[in-house]
Amino acid sequence: MADPARARRLAKRITTIVASAIEYEIKDPGLVGVTITDAKVTADLHDATVYYTVMGPTLDDEPDYAAAAAALERAKGVLRTKVGAGTGVRFTPTLTFTRDVTSDTVHRMDELLARARAADADLARVRVGAKPAGEADPYRDRGSADEPSDAGGLVIRTSDGLEAENTGDDYQAED
């Protein structure tokens, strides 16, 4: 088993080699618009999974994922040879190409966030014209407004209908 740091370094080197080979050396029309995003290498350094994305001819066109996958399968042997020559490891890892769905997930999350923002905006528009259902202060007794007494406290009506004076002394020390 190799050191995890060594596996990460090898994966980064494989990403660079494969991306450079696709961009400058392999002339396959199916690889136009293919971008290598990441690579993962197993702990024994024998297998590498290379992640890729595909861009369409224009921003509005859907990319041809099947053609890109077929082109990568055709170029797999050449790419593995270039990885073996460029890495200098004893055993050249086998390459497996997997479409990177991170950008699709990001796009989906952006759509969900936009939908949530629109729902929040609708709720804010409804909230502007809304009135409370009932009194603004439902706990205030309208019949007996709290008035100051002669002693400076507030007169409070209890549940029995009796009046009591609130002197503000909620805490009284015991002797």
From Swiss-Prot:
A GO cellular component entry from the record: cytosol
Would I find Cytoplasm among this entry's keywords? yes
Q: Where is this region: Disordered?
A: 129-175
- Annotated GO biological process: maturation of SSU-rRNA
Supply the alphabetized keyword list: Cytoplasm, Ribosome biogenesis
Q: Where in the cell is it found?
A: Cytoplasm
Give the GO molecular function terms: ribosomal small subunit binding
Ranges annotated as biased composition (Acidic residues): 162-175
Q: What does this protein do?
A: One of several proteins that assist in the late maturation steps of the functional core of the 30S ribosomal subunit. Associates with free 30S ribosomal subunits (but not with 30S subunits that are part of 70S ribosomes or polysomes). Required for efficient processing of 16S rRNA. May interact with the 5'-terminal helix region of 16S rRNA.
Family per record: Belongs to the RbfA family.
Question: How does this polypeptide assemble, per the annotation?
Answer: Monomer. Binds 30S ribosomal subunits, but not 50S ribosomal subunits or 70S ribosomes.
Q: What is this protein called?
A: Ribosome-binding factor A
Identify the gene encoding this protein: rbfA
